[in-house]
């Protein structure tokens, strides 16, 4: 199947990045937590338990047609058909890797986001996107090269889980393992879309929806410190920090957000989150992508150990996954091994993440989708004749 590419956009400076709907449109029930659905149904004169029933139909049974909800009376079904709908992003393209990984390009308006299913052993992880593109400009990430368009809505986030669950189905029937974990590590910076990401994660945790343990839902952030400080008051899930550099000078270069929220500010915020979190077992996951002769030297490992000496953590080393026109190279196995061993000598738990789905550009850092960029950054690149790479997957 052929794929068209349209750019994504998410801008931190603009006031509103959400999708605008006309007042005449039906309400999408996937945009609601169970409490919000109860309030919606109360306005229709219905009792709270109807929200519980609807949530089960939508998320336990994958139902999106009111007429098929047999324990909801016909009067309410007819009422709902007039004012509400159940709508998740549609699958535009599916790609299956030789290692069992599946990547879906999902349609959101006239753009596409990417969602990745990663089975391994007795678990299967779904990597979910939070924005159409990304505004953070991390130099080693394919998504960042697409620019930014907008935040995803709650329904567009939880709808990725719903759509994937529908396709994966029951393990005993399809031979494909059901989703056991969800990671907010797809396209976008989740903490720049808190108003939609948090309700979506609440639905993931809700027993009337997916009922995932808070230890099986992970939010990964590049370090939007004020939002992380706020998140600890809103929800408790597993936390992963995209650190990728052991000092501010290098992190400023490869992750410009560090110029605003430096490493100390970020790690102080992490400590506050861990102090109140039950989901993290007292430890945060540190993600560190290895770039050949950029951040993978022995001196970098020693610096990283110093940065993390007071932070209970597990370190995930991520072999960098190439994308077109990227300015970096992949670290050799010997450099990866040396980096890992150096950190382990300090007593850290250090895992080298296995690359999955790289044959379909579904590996970490390779997600691109189709983004209509709205940032001045890519407009400037076009002005000065620099090519903007849009990947066709």
UniProtKB/Swiss-Prot annotation:
Q: Which domain of life is it from?
A: Bacteria
| One GO CC term on file | cytoplasm
Q: Where is the signal peptide?
A: none
The EC number(s) given in the record are: 2.1.1.192
Residues that coordinate or bind [4Fe-4S] cluster = 134, 138, 141
Q: Which GO terms describe its molecular function?
A: 4 iron, 4 sulfur cluster binding; metal ion binding; rRNA (adenine(2503)-C2-)-methyltransferase activity; rRNA binding; tRNA (adenine(37)-C2)-methyltransferase activity; tRNA binding
Cofactor binding note of this UniProt entry: Binds 1 [4Fe-4S] cluster. The cluster is coordinated with 3 cysteines and an exchangeable S-adenosyl-L-methionine.
Disulfide bond is among the record's keywords: yes
User: Which CDD domains does the entry mention?
Assistant: Radical_SAM
Task: Quote additional remarks.
Answer: Reaction proceeds by a ping-pong mechanism involving intermediate methylation of a conserved cysteine residue.
* Disulfides per UniProt: 127-364
Q: Which family does it belong to?
A: Belongs to the radical SAM superfamily. RlmN family.
InterPro entries reported for this sequence: Aldolase_TIM, Methyltransferase_A, RlmN_N, RNA_MTrfase_RlmN, rRNA_lsu_MTrfase_RlmN/Cfr, rSAM
Query: Which residues are recorded as binding S-adenosyl-L-methionine?
Result: 188-189, 220, 242-244, 321
The protein here is known as Dual-specificity RNA methyltransferase RlmN
Q: Which reaction does it catalyse?
A: adenosine(2503) in 23S rRNA + 2 reduced [2Fe-2S]-[ferredoxin] + 2 S-adenosyl-L-methionine = 2-methyladenosine(2503) in 23S rRNA + 5'-deoxyadenosine + L-methionine + 2 oxidized [2Fe-2S]-[ferredoxin] + S-adenosyl-L-homocysteine; adenosine(37) in tRNA + 2 reduced [2Fe-2S]-[ferredoxin] + 2 S-adenosyl-L-methionine = 2-methyladenosine(37) in tRNA + 5'-deoxyadenosine + L-methionine + 2 oxidized [2Fe-2S]-[ferredoxin] + S-adenosyl-L-homocysteine
Q: Name one Pfam family in it.
A: RlmN_N
Relate the protein's function as given in its record: Specifically methylates position 2 of adenine 2503 in 23S rRNA and position 2 of adenine 37 in tRNAs. m2A2503 modification seems to play a crucial role in the proofreading step occurring at the peptidyl transferase center and thus would serve to optimize ribosomal fidelity.
PANTHER family hit by this protein: 23S RRNA METHYLTRANSFERASE (PTHR30544), RADICAL SAM CORE DOMAIN-CONTAINING PROTEIN (PTHR30544:SF5)
Listed A to Z, the keywords are:
4Fe-4S, Cytoplasm, Disulfide bond, Iron, Iron-sulfur, Metal-binding, Methyltransferase, rRNA processing, S-adenosyl-L-methionine, Transferase, tRNA processing
Subcellular localization(s) per the UniProt record: Cytoplasm
Q: Where is the Radical SAM core domain?
A: 120-359
Q: Where is the active site?
A: 114 (proton acceptor), 364 (s-methylcysteine intermediate)
